[in-house]
């Protein structure tokens, strides 16, 4: 007779695709082991099931979060499964707690197996979120906000930077002394000429190796030059003294050995289309109070031979061009440098700023550098090989360009770099190891190759990004530049935030280096807190084969957020679907909580329906929690149809599509557990045993559990031991826990038809772990 039952069961499933809508009682020795194994293998929709798979789609992850913030400040920590700041985000809160400078936040939380990173947020007293995307590695997450000197809690790439300084090359007294005997320049002179007693070069200065000249008082418009060292000079110094204005109306070129010195009160005026050209070992020095102005250009060609150009006064002209060969040019600015454009192509050239630079554009190739120790404002393109932002410095640009490899940025503490337009992050941006830097960008430029590159933003940098456009795709080829930053670019302790929300303060000082400054606004971030919802989908025919649409009972459970030292647990259970036509109940067994630690178990919404279903059922004890045994077992309902108002033999299928009855209002049960002693939130993966049950012929109910709990019972009964052994060998399942709201199959739709990737996952449960996000067709699933 048992063989005939087996044949009928197999035939009905494989040949006629009839649906099993009720269970027979759990019988001992229902089939012999080989026949039972054959039935299981033939009827389950997946063959060659992963023998090591446990059918779980979540796992426990340990998070360690350290905060080195303000002394005495407690910072809320919130861990999300997605970007919580995105307007389109459906990020769910996985864990929350508090951290400060002396106490880290350590918690065990549940994460979907498909989740490869989490978003750790540190919230300040204004309600502003600093977010750090952290990869899950070896089931751990380690996040660090800020860093104290000598701290061992954060792993940070150490970078030591320095903005070169330069003392004023001359004192006022020294220049005053030199101009006292300097020779006044005459029109047409070549200052490098040799002595000639029969010409204009018959003055003693033309015999000297180091020659000092000066511009006459008042105005001087004549042209002169330095032709080189052929006349015996090895240094030519030209002073533009106080009260003198040298007007350059065409090209004035000085070769090899000329230093142009503009004294306090002296002035050079370069008219439109005119140029001051310094070649090879020639360079300029502008003393405090001196100036070079006009609509013309300054050109430094073929290097300054190791001499530093120095400005402590005012340079306000059209262009500063540094080109040609040589070993590079250092241009030191301690005053004010105003340019329409700065162009540098000589390899090794460095623009070093300790004053104020305002430019229409800065265009340096990838072998030139900018080192900013004070304030820079570039209206348009800002391009360079390497940029160093010194301590307490500020730079603003319209566009942050890209011009090849090694065009990196190093930011020291209390530095701000702002790009009001597009900024290339196809580079390494390295922040401080002590203190914080702020990188403000409107839009990250979509540079070809960025997403595949090893570019990064690392260490203690806050990235304040205006355009947070995201593809919301995990596939790297579909990422936006902001996706790249979030999923790959931010490393170590680098964070991002919404505009105006950075935990960073640098007040403006009109007389100092910080002109714009920064202080966050007072409006908190608008972050919606959504708790995680896990779906439990059951087949009711255990231990016999089913139809495997996994909709006989579907529960959506809103979970408490993972945390430590809690004395109250709240679970919100939605009965989404009843795809069975027999009486089914459901319960919750919580591992790790002994009944002796329970103060009360109360029920909010749905309590009346629960009570009615239990009083009319023999499946569960009619109590808040069962008295048998030491484990905490909470009956959720004794009859799934009863809570929806169906009585007696009225048992329609509910909410499973096709010919089932649709539900307009989903039954919800709130379960509130109050404990005597605080505990950590129980793990969904390891501790929450949601199960369904039906009444067999004996006294005990038959229970249907998730695979990881299928050898345990919550005061009911399981299959016979020999049946359990066959189930263990075949490794099929009657229950699934999906770490999201599950769009479950419609009635009579086998799960492999609803989800094409389900079979691939079942074959190897280390792959296709997000199969539940990809239904084959919307008409094959029910989604709420």
Q: What spans do the regions from the language model cover?
A:
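Bacterial N-terminal signal peptides that target proteins for export
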Residues: 1-10
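Extended low-complexity, serine/threonine- and proline-enriched intrinsically disordered segments
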Residues: 73-87, 580-624, 686-697
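C-terminal motif of bacterial Sec signal peptides marking the signal peptidase cleavage site
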Residues: 19-22
């Amino acid at each position: 007779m048992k063989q005939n039952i087996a044949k009928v069961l197999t035939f009905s499933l494989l040949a006629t695709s009839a649906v099993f809508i009720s269970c027979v009682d759990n019988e001992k020795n229902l089939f012999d082991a080989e026949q039972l194994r054959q039935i299981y293998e033939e009827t389950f929709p997946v063959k060659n099931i992963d023998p090591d798979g446990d059918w779980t789609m979540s796992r426990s992850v340990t998070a360690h979060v350290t905060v080195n913030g303000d002394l005495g400040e407690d910072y809320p920590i919130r861990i999300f499964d997605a970007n919580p700041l995105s307007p389109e985000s459906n990020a769910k809160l996985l864990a929350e707690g508090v951290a400060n400078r002396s106490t880290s936040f350590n918690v065990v939380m549940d994460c979907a197996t498909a989740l490869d990173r989490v978003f750790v947020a540190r919230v300040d007293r204004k309600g502003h979120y600093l977010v750090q995307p952290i990869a899950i590695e070896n089931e751990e997450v380690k996040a660090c906000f800020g860093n104290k000197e000598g701290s061992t809690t954060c792993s940070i790439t150490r970078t030591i930077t320095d903005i070169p300084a330069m003392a004023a090359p001359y004192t006022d007294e020294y220049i005053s002394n030199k101009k006292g005997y300097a020779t006044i320049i005459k029109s047409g002179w070549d200052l490098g000429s040799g002595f000639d007693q029969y010409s204009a070069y018959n003055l003693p200065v033309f015999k000297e190796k180091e020659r000092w000249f000066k511009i006459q008082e008042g105005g001087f418009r004549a042209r002169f030059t330095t032709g080189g060292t052929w006349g015996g000079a090895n240094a030519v110094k030209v002073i533009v003294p106080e009260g003198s204005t040298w007007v350059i109306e065409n090209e004035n070129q000085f070769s090899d050995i000329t230093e142009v010195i503009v004294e306090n009160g002296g002035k050079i005026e370069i008219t439109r289309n005119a140029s001051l050209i310094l070649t090879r070992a020639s360079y300029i020095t502008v003393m405090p109070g001196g100036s070079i102005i006009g609509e013309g250009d300054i050109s430094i060609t073929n290097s300054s031979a190791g001499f530093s150009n120095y400005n402590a006064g005012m340079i306000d002209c059209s262009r500063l061009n540094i080109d040609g060969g040589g070993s590079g040019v250092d241009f030191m600015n301690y005053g004010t440098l105003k340019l329409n454009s700065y162009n540098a192509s000589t390899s090794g050239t460095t623009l070093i700023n300790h004053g104020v630079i305002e430019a229409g554009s800065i265009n340096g190739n990838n072998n030139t550098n900018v080192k900013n120790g004070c304030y820079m404002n570039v209206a348009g393109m800002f391009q360079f090989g390497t940029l160093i932002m010194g301590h307490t410095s500020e730079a603003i640009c319209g566009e942050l360009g890209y011009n090849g490899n090694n065009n990196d940025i190093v930011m020291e503490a209390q530095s701000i770099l702002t790009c009001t337009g597009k900024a290339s992050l196809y580079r390494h941006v390295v922040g401080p190891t002590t203190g914080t830097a702020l990188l403000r960008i409107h839009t990250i430029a979509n540079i070809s190759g960025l997403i595949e590159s090893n570019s990064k933003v690392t260490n203690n940098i806050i990235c304040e990004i205006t355009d947070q456009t995201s593809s919301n795709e995990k596939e790297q080829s579909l990422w936006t530049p902001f996706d790249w930053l979030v999923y790959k670019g931010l490393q170590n302790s680098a964070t991002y935030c919404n505009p105006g929300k950075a935990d960073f303060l640098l007040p403006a000082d009109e007389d100092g280096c910080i002109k714009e400054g920064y202080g966050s606004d007072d409006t908190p971030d608008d972050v919606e807190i959504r708790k995680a919802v896990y779906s439990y989908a059951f087949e009711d025919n255990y231990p016999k084969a089913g139809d495997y649409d996994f909709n006989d009972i579907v529960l959506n459970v809103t979970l408490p957020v993972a945390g430590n030292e809690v004395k109250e647990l709240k679970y919100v259970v939605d009965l989404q679907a009843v795809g069975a036509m027999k009486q089914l109940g459901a319960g919750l067994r919580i591992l790790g909580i002994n009944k002796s630690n329970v103060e009360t178990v109360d029920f909010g919404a749905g309590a009346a329906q629960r009570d009615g279903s239990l009083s009319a059922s023999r499946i569960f004890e009619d109590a808040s929690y069962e008295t048998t045994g030491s484990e905490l077992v909470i009956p959720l309902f004794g009859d799934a149809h009863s809570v929806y108002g169906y009585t007696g033999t009225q048992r329609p299928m509910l909410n499973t599509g096709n010919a089932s009855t649709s539900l307009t209002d989903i039954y919800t049960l709130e379960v509130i557990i109050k404990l005597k002693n605080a505990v950590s939130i129980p793990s969904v993966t390891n501790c929450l045993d949601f199960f369904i049950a039906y009444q067999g012929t004996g006294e005990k109910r038959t229970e249907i559990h998730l695979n990881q709990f299928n050898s345990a019972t919550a005061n009911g009964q399981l299959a016979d031991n020999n049946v359990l052994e066959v189930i263990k060998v075949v490794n099929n399942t009657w229950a699934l826990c999906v770490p999201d709201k599950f769009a479950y199959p419609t009635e009579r739709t086998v799960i492999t038809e609803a989800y094409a990737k389900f079979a691939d996952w079942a074959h190897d449960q280390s792959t296709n772990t997000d199969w539940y996000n990809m239904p084959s067709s919307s008409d094959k699933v029910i989604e709420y």
